[in-house]
Each structure stands twice: as C-alpha cells, then as structure tokens.
C-alpha cells in the first residue's frame, strides 16, 4: 500500500501521529503493539487497556518498550500521553476518556465484552478497528449502524483471512471480473477438538487452549467466511460449506465446483482443507468479455470459465498499521458488513448434550460453529454460536445436531441479545 506509507511518513514529519488505543494484551495485541511502536512512522500506541494491567506491563517489557505509565488517573494519563509516553490502565473509563486517542483496536475475540466496549468507544467518539471476527460475524451489521449513528467509523482489520480476502475480492472485481467463490485454505479440520486436545499446541505458541480449539474445530473459519459473506452478499452452498479436501494447488481445483450452480447462487463463501498455498485465501472469478478471456489465457490463468486468484498467506498483525491508516486517513474500511446478515454461524453439539448442561464459550468442549444462510437460520430458529455461551440446555441434543433456541434457556439481561433483536429488524 504505497499511498499509505507515504501518508504515514507525512504524519511523522508533521509530528501528528495517529494515536491508537489497544484493548487487550494477548498475543495479537502484543504483535500489534510491536508492529506499531517499532516499525510504523506516523502512528503510536498511546494507551493499552487490560483488566489486569500487570499483563499489559509484561507485554511492554517483553517487547523492550519502557516509556510507559501505569495509571487509572485520567489527568495523569492525559499528561503522560502529552509527554510522549504510553499509558497502561485497568480502568475502562480512563481508557475511553483519553483526549488524544482517536481509534481503538479491539482484539479480544470475546462477544459480550467486545460488544460492550465497542459501543462505549463509539459513545466516546472513538473509531474502532476490530480484529474480532467472531463478534463481527454475529453482530457486525448492528455495530456498523451504531457507529454511523455516533458519527464514527468501524471496520474489521487487514491481516486475518476476512480482510485479506476482501482486498483480493476488490482487486478482482476492480478488473471487471465477477467473483463467484471467496475461499479460505485450511490446514486441517476436526470438529471434535477441545481445549484438552489443543493444550500442548496452545502452550507452544503462547495462546489460550480455547483459541487453538477455535482454529482446529472449524468454528474460526466459519466466523471468517461469514464475515466475508456479510460484506459481499454471498451465501453458502449448504450448512457447513462444501469443505472439499485436496493436497493440490488452488489453481488446479476450479473443477470441483459446478460453474452454472455458482452463477445461479450468485457467489458463495467456501474453504478447502489441505490445499496449497496454506494458509492462504483465494477468489474464483469469471468474465464474459472476449478480450479479457484472451489475455487471461495469455497470462497463464487458463481458459476459464473460472479463474483462480489467490494470496498465499495472511500476515496477522503485520498489516494492522495499513488497516488503521486506511480507516482514519482514507475513509477506506478494509471490510465492513452490508446492511443485514447473509450468513450466520450456528451452534452445533460437539458431544451429546443433556438437560442442565451449560454451554461453554467458543473453542470449548460443548459446541462448534457451522455457517448457514441467514434466512434458514431465522426460519429454523437456530442458536447463534456467538450467543451460545452461558445458555442452559433444556432437552437432550445429539452430537452434531444444530441447537435451536427451543433447546436452551438464554441468560437474562445480556446486551448481545438486545443487539441481536435490533439487528434482526434491520
């Protein structure tokens, strides 16, 4: 993004950096802080909020960043930022009331907490860049509406699969081609992985076992592809997606899909297990223009009717700075939902569930997530994966059955349920 680094260098020369507030101090937040503070001119992390400030302190110390102040006092915090320091705080109101912070980055992966703090950020006039695909898939349309009502900006960031895919989708569409598949390349899939099975892997990478389980059991890819569908208006071919398996290169797999069916559907989101390049993303697109067809063949993309475009990786927090600059300086959100949902993620029993069982969170022992088309979700009264945590099962549910709202009692008084009621009416 050549135009972005030029804009950031100009900000640096004018001593007018974009001031970022970071929510959370996990692995992704750590990477973002490292990237912005060490390698991004024209941008600084002015504040980090974490419910336990000591964890944020450990992040700064591990990165060799020493110019910070730990405080919950708003006056001291504002002065520290004015003096060029970063602030670490465990008080959310102090964090949200900081004068100079203009954009907040939310990367917790939590639904209820994430929704609460994003809405509070909007109310305090802060723009929000989210790295929370789980929340955006579940409540993205209503969050975007709330942002517009508060005259602030909201978007998902680049670096994770939804943002990388949307960049590719726009690139392909900008050349006049018609995208018919937005796809994700997964290394493996096992719906029945749990925090117990993923404990060793999680520890080796410094992540929570639930996060590792979310990746392995298919829930994460479901949320990611739902975000893309909701930003493009695409659908899924069936509940759970087609999820073909192959060890071939993505360029050689267009034959797996029925072209006429793709055209009839108007485009789908998908994933392929085991293909190359992993962990990349791809767009299969078509064109009816004879001149384009001629030179796509000349460019070694084949004779169609499906042409393969791909990005061989997703670079996580390395792309965070460009995401922020695009949102703030260019009013160019990486990926935002359309006016309503098109694909949702529904809670599916990972094991037999019995009356009295309380459903644990995403990446837990009880459920995994599957994509389904929004109209089907609404007509069958299916339980959203993003709203399933804390629900109490009231009747037996067999393994691999999708839960409905008739199968559970929902906790009372949750903001996320009220937001869903609003979103359904959009």
Question: PLM features: residue spans?
Answer:
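N-terminal glycine-/serine-/threonine-rich beta1-alpha1-beta2 phosphate-ribose binding loop
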Residues: 1-120
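C-terminal catalytic/substrate-binding lobe primarily of soluble NAD(P)-dependent oxidoreductases
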Residues: 2-11, 201, 205-426
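Short glycine/serine/threonine-rich phosphate/pyrophosphate-binding segments
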Residues: 28-32, 107-116, 131, 137-141, ...
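Short gly/pro/ser/thr-enriched loop/turn and capping motifs at secondary-structure boundaries
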Residues: 55, 135-144, 161-165, 186-190, ...
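Rossmann-fold NAD(P)-binding glycine/threonine-rich loop
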Residues: 112-124, 132-152, 158-159
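Rossmann-like NAD(P)H-binding beta-loop-alpha module
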Residues: 147-151, 155-220
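Short, ordered loop/turn segments at secondary-structure junctions
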Residues: 25, 51, 93, 109-110, ...
């Amino acid at each position: 993004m050549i135009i972005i680094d030029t804009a950031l260098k100009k900000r640096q020369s004018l001593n007018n950096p974009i001031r970022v507030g970071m929510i959370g101090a996990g692995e992704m937040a750590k990477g973002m802080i490292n990237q912005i503070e060490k390698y991004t001119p024209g941008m600084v992390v002015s504040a980090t909020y974490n419910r336990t400030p000591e964890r944020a302190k450990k992040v700064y110390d591990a990165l060799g960043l020493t110019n910070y102040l730990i405080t919950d006092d708003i006056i001291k915090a504002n002065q520290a930022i004015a003096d060029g320091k970063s602030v670490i705080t465990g008080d959310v109101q102090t964090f949200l009331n900081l004068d100079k912070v203009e954009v907040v980055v939310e990367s917790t992966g939590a639904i209820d907490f994430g929704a609460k703090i994003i809405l509070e950020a909007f109310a305090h006039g802060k723009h929000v860049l989210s790295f929370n695909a789980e929340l955006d898939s579940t409540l993205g349309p209503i969050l975007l509406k709330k942002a517009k009502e508060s005259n602030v900006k909201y978007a998902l960031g680049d670096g994770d699969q939804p943002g990388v895919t949307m960049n590719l989708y726009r690139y392909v569409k900008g050349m006049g081609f018609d995208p018919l598949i937005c796809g994700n390349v997964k290394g493996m899939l096992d719906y029945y992985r749990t925090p117990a099975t993923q404990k060793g892997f999680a520890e080796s990478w410094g992540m929570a076992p639930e996060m590792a389980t979310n990746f392995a059991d298919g829930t994460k890819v479901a949320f990611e592809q739902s975000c893309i569908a909701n930003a493009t208006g695409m659908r899924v071919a069936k509940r759970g997606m087609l999820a073909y398996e192959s060890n071939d290169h993505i360029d050689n797999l267009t034959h797996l899909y029925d072209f006429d069916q793709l055209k009839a559907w108007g485009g789908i989101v998908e994933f392929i297990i085991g293909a190359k390049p992993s962990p990349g993303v791809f767009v299969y697109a078509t064109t009816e223009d004879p001149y384009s067809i001629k030179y796509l063949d000349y460019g070694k993309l084949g004779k169609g009717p499906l042409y393969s475009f791909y990005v061989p990786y997703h670079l996580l927090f390395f792309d965070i700075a460009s995401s922020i600059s695009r949102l703030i300086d260019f009013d160019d959100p990486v990926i935002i939902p359309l006016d309503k949902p098109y694909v949702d993620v529904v809670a599916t029993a990972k094991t037999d569930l019995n009356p009295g069982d309380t459903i644990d969170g995403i990446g837990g022992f009880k459920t995994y997530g599957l994509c389904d088309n929004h109209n089907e979700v609404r007509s069958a009264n299916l339980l959203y994966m993003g709203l399933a945590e804390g629900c109490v099962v009231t009747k037996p549910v067999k393994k691999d059955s999708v839960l409905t709202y008739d199968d559970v009692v929902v906790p009372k008084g949750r903001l996320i349920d009220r937001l869903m009621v609003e979103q359904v009416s959009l």
